[in-house]
Regions:
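Accessory "access/gating" subregions that flank catalytic or transport cores
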Residues: 11-26, 145-168, 174-188, 192-199, ...
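Conserved structured core elements
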Residues: 31-36, 52, 56, 99-102, ...
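Catalytic phosphate/nucleotide-handling subdomain of diverse soluble enzymes
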Residues: 42-48, 53-69, 200-206, 210-212, ...
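Aromatic-rich carbohydrate-recognition surfaces in CAZymes
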Residues: 88-124, 128-137
Length: 359
């Protein structure tokens, strides 16, 4: 059985260091948080035009465009890509366009600004209703939002008429809870649990806790293996997500290329829906391993793996961006953003990314 309450999850997690005893350096922490925001935006933007595509379709698109090595944002092709994606393609980027992967970081920030460490599932639910338009949330989030409007509140909102509750929607909301808990993965995971439990259960919850804990740990830890293990230490040891992550770590350590690792991932968890938490989390782990010292390689191989490409690219970009810091991110990925982020969150429609990082 895979639990969905925080008490049970904590009881089944492996041993781990809950406080990494980070030495506080305000300027360095700001640079890391800014790097995370920028990295998240860049990874999301790279994956946005091909969201939902399988790897084979992405490979064909690159071949048709005569791109042997992907080392920049994707080119636009009006015959294949919808016009709405033009602003997300090479040479056409003026800012980070609206994406739900970025909206939820702002939503979480607003809830935290309101209630801080006391942010509860109910606080987050009310923040959604107050700040998010209903027609621009999807799958599990749409089901949960509908439940809120019918006075079905957490935790029941996660399971009532919600067949998507192990999909990736909670995992993409994790980042802010890691940003605000430097070196404290247990607290980051707890805040992520409060958020995830309004719309997800089981591995849907674990995905968000896993990512938040990794981000908290990345403020202090150097190796991606240690960062991933910090994430694993906050979720049940024997859940399907933990198993997929451990398998992927083994393949990354024993196989010479990300393509071979992808083959193993596809054989093992490729049967899940393309928007499920588990298979996409495996791609995130792959991207972290192969991008440990190379931001570009990390987001590129993750997005080329297919499935929910804007989500996985965003998470890998966020973790690597935080680990490396804003000053160490390649200009060709960051400069086109022009420090600007569009959003559908009420009263937060157009922000400077640097201002969001300061908050």
């Amino acid at each position: 059985a895979e639990p969905s309450t925080l008490v049970e999850i904590k009881a089944e997690r492996p041993d781990g260091k809950r406080d990494l005893e980070l030495k506080w350096d305000k300027d360095r922490i700001y640079e890391q948080i800014l790097g995370a925001w920028l990295g998240r935006a860049a990874g999301c933007l790279l994956g946005k035009p091909v969201e939902g595509w399988p790897k084979a379709r992405i490979d064909k698109y690159l071949k048709d465009k005569k791109i042997e090595i992907l080392d920049d944002y994707l080119p636009f092709d009006e015959k294949i890509l919808p016009g709405v994606h033009k602003v997300s393609t090479k040479g056409n980027i003026k800012f980070m366009p609206r994406d739900d992967d970025m909206d939820y970081v702002i939503i979480g920030l607003l809830a935290l600004e309101n209630r801080g460490i006391k942010t509860s599932p109910r606080t987050l639910a009310h923040t959604w209703v107050d700040r998010l338009p209903f027609n621009l949330v999807y799958t599990a989030e749409e089901c949960a939002y509908r439940n809120f409007t019918n006075s079905i509140w957490p935790p029941m909102s996660a399971t009532h008429r919600n067949p998507f509750r192990e999909w990736i929607g909670a995992q993409i909301r994790a980042d802010i809870f890691g940003y605000v808990t430097p070196g404290l993965p247990e607290i980051g995971a707890k805040l992520a649990f409060n958020d995830a439990s309004i719309s997800h259960d089981k591995n849907g919850i674990y995905g968000e806790m896993f990512v938040a804990a990794m981000l908290s740990a990345a403020f202090k830890l150097e190796s991606v293996k240690d960062i991933i293990n910090a994430g694993l230490s906050e979720i049940p040891k024997n859940c399907r997500l933990s198993e997929a992550v451990r398998d992927t770590m083994h393949w990354c350590e024993t196989l010479p290329s990300w393509e071979l690792v992808w083959e193993k991932i596809n054989e093992s968890v490729g049967h899940y829906h393309g928007v499920h938490t588990i298979n996409n989390a495996a791609l995130i782990v792959m991207g972290l391993y192969f991008g440990e010292n190379d931001f570009e390689k990390g987001i590129v191989c993750t997005v080329r793996g297919g499935w929910d490409t804007d989500c996985t690219g965003a998470t890998v970009g966020s973790i690597l961006g935080l680990r490396l810091g804003a000053n160490n991110l390649p200009s060709k990925w960051i400069s086109p953003l022009n420090d600007r982020l569009k959003s559908v969150v009420r009263d937060e429609n157009d922000n400077k990314i640097s201002d969001l990082a300061k908050r």
